[in-house]
Amino acid sequence: MAQYTKAMGTVRKYTPATLKRDGKPAFVYVYRHLQTGQVAYTQVPGVTEHHLNRQFKDPNWENKRPTMRQDLWRPMAVADFGDHQAACDAYDGLVYLRYKRTHDGKKDIKGWRKTNAAGNVWQDGQYRPVYTQEALADLSTVTEAVKVPVTIHWEDLWRRGAAESWPENADHSVLKRWDAIYPQSLEKRLAKEAKVPGETTAEQ
């Protein structure tokens, strides 16, 4: 991660120690923007200016800096890593892979993406599905890399795709319908089932 940190500054807002101090579970949240399909990663519920500043450093017309309106962000997946260091490493890895795709590997990635007749990233209105697809590929990559059991809670199992395409250390479940509306309740509910024994979330 040193290359990313040097180029972009501090990636994570929370360290393993601060997450434990604040009673936060070892989660990584994967949010999708309802209008554009863009994805933001967070360590606690909700998308903030910090996340947008770090994860959309050099926006362009195909990948504009998304709005921070909370009603437009929905949790696509919540990954429980069961270990705060693993969760922080996974978060850093997700942001780093995004950075590599949009900077160092930009030309190569462009050739892999579905494009329209003009050679631009395919879209339906403002929505570009490629961003959620790439986010899921990156989540699979970091899940395998951390080498600890991971439970991924999905907004819908069809987003996960085929279970056999995921690493062996990944288990899967489905979020409840109201989790997208009440993110703080989502954190508390999932924390009760979290993998780290003896750790619970602090009361909000």
Swiss-Prot record:
Pfam families: Mhr1. GO terms for molecular function: DNA strand exchange activity; single-stranded DNA binding; structural constituent of ribosome. Signal peptide: none annotated. InterPro entries: Ribosomal_mL67. One of its GO terms (cellular component) is ribonucleoprotein complex. It comes from the Eukaryota. It is found in: Nucleus; Mitochondrion. One of its GO terms (biological process) is mitochondrial genome maintenance. Coiled coil: none annotated. Keywords: Mitochondrion, Nucleus, Ribonucleoprotein, Ribosomal protein, Transcription, Transcription regulation. Belongs to the mitochondrion-specific ribosomal protein mL67 family. PANTHER family: LARGE RIBOSOMAL SUBUNIT PROTEIN ML67, MITOCHONDRIAL HOMOLOGOUS RECOMBINATION PROTEIN 1. Transcription factor involved in regulation of RNA polymerase II-dependent transcription. Also involved in regulation of mitochondrial DNA recombination, maintenance and repair, and generation of homoplasmic cells. This is Large ribosomal subunit protein mL67. It comes from Yarrowia lipolytica (strain CLIB 122 / E 150) (Yeast).
